[in-house]
Curated annotation (Swiss-Prot):
Record gene name: nikC
Complexes and interactors: The complex is composed of two ATP-binding proteins (NikD and NikE), two transmembrane proteins (NikB and NikC) and a solute-binding protein (NikA).
Family membership noted in the UniProt record: Belongs to the binding-protein-dependent transport system permease family. OppBC subfamily.
Listed name of the protein: Nickel import system permease protein NikC
Source species taxonomy: Bacteria, Bacillati, Bacillota, Bacilli, Bacillales
Transmembrane feature ranges: 10-30, 73-93, 108-128, 186-206, 238-258
Record keyword Thylakoid present: no
GO cellular component term of the entry, any: plasma membrane
């Protein structure tokens, strides 16, 4: 048990430290250096002045990665907020109201989840003009379904419990039951899913930008930087390795944090497997 607790604490520390470092570094770099073209300094090697060198337009790679974190993480957070609001709201009503609302939502989810997520995202993003904002729409349209299904499942498990029955017996308003009684039961599981999905959404955003459906030059964004670095993989591999490494590390941190949160949630419910 102590090992589990220590492992989770270490993961949380790494997670918080990562977010802190990203935020602090924003104050030490200029967004102008991330987009300003300087053809006299193209492909500068790694140095104290340019920690990761410069790209084919003379822009500092380290600065572009830090500013790119702002773009990628902001869009990811915005997407998650939209997903949670839509998914949890539909899940609450589908689980509580039952009837045709539940059947309609479930049939829609069954159809949506039967198709690979990324294929749908590519199809949707292709209909819009490439931009980070359109990625928010494309990802939200498909990802809310997981949150609706999870929320409905939790609501169904709570509906037969005495406190809900008593609330209904005393004609407590539906809004009060949903917000004050059911929502607190949903929040822990939703937070775990959000943290796990954070890494997935970063990967989706980077992948869509990589194939030209997301951020457009000169906007610094990790996926767009991957696309740019691909053309110089032989002569200047750092242009590809740097953004790829940042994406991989970020996704790993959020995945480990999600696993740790899930373990703690199961432990609190008495469902934790000691051999895990």
């Amino acid at each position: 048990m102590h090992k589990i607790f220590s492992k989770n604490n270490l993961i949380f520390f790494v997670f918080v430290a990562f977010i802190f470092v990203v935020i602090v570094l924003q104050f030490f770099v200029s967004s102008e250096n991330a987009t300003k073209v300087n053809l006299s300094q193209t492909f500068e090697p790694i140095s104290w002045l340019h920690l990761l060198g410069t790209d084919d337009y003379g822009r500092d790679l380290f600065t572009r990665i830090i500013i790119g974190a702002r773009s990628t993480l902001f869009v990811t957070v915005l997407t998650l907020i939209a997903i949670v609001v839509i998914g949890v709201t539909l899940g609450l009503f589908a689980g509580y109201k039952k009837g045709w609302i539940e059947r309609l939502v479930l049939r829609f989810i069954d159809v949506g989840l039967s198709i690979p997520e990324f294929i749908i995202m590519i199809a949707l993003a292709s209909f819009f003009q490439p931009s980070l904002w359109n990625l928010v729409i494309s990802i939200t349209v498909i990802k809310w379904m997981n949150y609706t299904r999870l929320t409905r499942s939790i609501v169904n498990s709570e509906m037969n419990k005495p406190y809900i029955k008593m609330a209904q017996l005393f004609h407590v308003p539906t809004r009060t039951i949903l917000i004050r009684h059911l929502t607190p039961k949903i929040i822990p599981a939703i937070i775990v899913l959000m943290v796990v999905d954070f890494g997935k959404i970063i990967l989706y955003i980077s992948s869509l930008s990589f194939i030209g459906l997301g951020a457009q030059p000169p906007t610094p964004e990790w996926g767009a930087m991957l696309q740019q670095g691909r053309d110089f993989i032989s002569s200047h591999p750092i242009m590809l390795i740097a953004p790829a490494s940042v994406i991989a590390i970020t996704i790993l941190i959020f995945n480990l944090t999600g696993d740790a949160l899930r373990d703690r949630l199961l432990k609190q419910r008495g469902e934790y497997d000691e051999s895990h």
